[in-house]
C-alpha cells in the first residue's frame, strides 16, 4: 500500500475511495505475459499500484514493476485505461476501492523476474490461451480479457 493511501486509510478507514493506479503488463517475444500470484487475495495479477502525490503515472508504473517483480521497464506503450463498476473491489482487509487504472504494455525490460517486495507469492509467464479469468484478481479481469482478445494484434 502506498504512503498516500496508507495515510488516507488512517483517516477514513475502509470507506470507498477512488484510487488512481498505474500498472505494467510485461509481454515476452512469445506473447506470454508475466503475472504474479498476489499474497493478499491469492489471485494472479500484473504489477501495479497507487500513484503517489505529484508522481508521474509512468514513473509510478515503473516503480511498481521494479518493487514487485524486480524488472526495469525500458519501453512502455499505453495499453488501456481500466475504470467503472468492474473495478469496484473490496480487498481482503476490508479496504474498498473504485479503481481508475492506467495500464502500459512493456516488451523490453532489464533484469530477471524476482519476487522483490513480498506482494507476490510466485511469478510466472503465462501463454494468453492458458489464462483462466476466474484465477485473475477481480478488478483487473477486464484488462486481461482485453489483452486476450487483442493478442494477435499486439
Enumerate the language-model features and the residues they cover.
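A generic structural micro-feature
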Residues: 14-18, 92-100, 117-120
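Short connector loops at helix/strand junctions that flank enzyme active sites
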Residues: 19, 39-41, 46, 73, ...
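NUDIX/MutT-family hydrolases
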Residues: 103-107, 114-144
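Conserved hydrophobic "DFG−1" position in protein kinase catalytic cores
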Residues: 26-27, 35, 106, 125
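Active-site-adjacent beta-strand/loop module that shapes the phosphate/pyrophosphate-binding cleft
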Residues: 82-112
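Acidic, metal-coordinating catalytic segment for phosphate/diphosphate chemistry
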Residues: 1-23
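Conserved Nudix-box catalytic region and its N-terminal flanking loop in Nudix hydrolases
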Residues: 28-68
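A short coil-to-beta-strand element that immediately follows conserved catalytic motifs
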Residues: 72-82
